[in-house]
Amino acid sequence: GRGYGKGELYSTIYTGRSIGEEIDMKRQVTMEEISDGKLYSSNDLVKADCGDCEGCHACCTGMGSSIVLDPLDIVRICRGTGATFEALLAGKIELNVVDGIILPNLKMTGEEEGCGFLTREGRCSIHPFRPGICRLFPLGRYYEENGFRYFLQVHECQKENRTKVKVKKWLDTPNLKDYETYIARWHGVLIQLQEYIAAHPESAKAVSMDVLQRFYLTPYQTEEFYSEFFQRMDEAKNIL
C-alpha cells in the first residue's frame, strides 16, 4: 500500500460503521487515528484475515443502523434467501434517513442487539451472499477523484494477531473490477443526491421514494446486475 501525508483528513471514506463519508468528515478525524497509515489496492496484502472469525461475532452486534445496504446487497440477499425486499423490511432490515436520503440497513434486534441473520451459534446465516460492508470489514474505503482505495481500521476488529491476505481475496467478490466501478458510481450518486436535497429540502421525500423504487424495489431481471443498474442510473439523471 501507499502512505499519505501526516495530518491528511479523510473527507471521503467509508468505514462500514456509517454511510461514513460526510459523518466522519464532520468529525474531522485523521487517517492516523484509525488506520495503519497505508492505502491499499485490491492486489495488495493487508493484515485483515481474522481466522474465519472463530469464536467471535462482535462486529455482527451493536452496530445500530450503520450497516447500510446498497442495491446489489439487496439483490444478493433477496436471491439468496428467496425473500422479497418487502418481506425483508418486515423483520431483517429497516429504513433510516442517511444524510437526507432514506436507505435500508441491517436491523439489530434482541438483548444482544444482533443482526437478524446471526444464528444462535453466533455465525452468519447469509455468509455466501453477505453485504458489501460485511465483506469489507475491518477495511474501509478511501474515496478519491477516480474511484477509491482501501485502508485498514486498526481499532475496530477485536481479533488479535490477524494475518496477511490479499484485499481481493478478503472481499470475496466476483468480477471485482466491475464491483469497484459500481461502488464508486453509487457513492457518486448518493453524494449528488445529498447535495441536491440540501439545496432543495422540500424534495427530500420524493427523491428518497424515487431512489427506493428505482434501485431497490423494482426487481433486477438480469443475473449480471451491473449493466441493468447502470442503465437505471443513467435514467435517474433527469431527477437531479
Where are these regions (language model features)?
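Short loop/turn segments that flank or connect secondary-structure elements
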Residues: 22-86, 90-114, 118-240
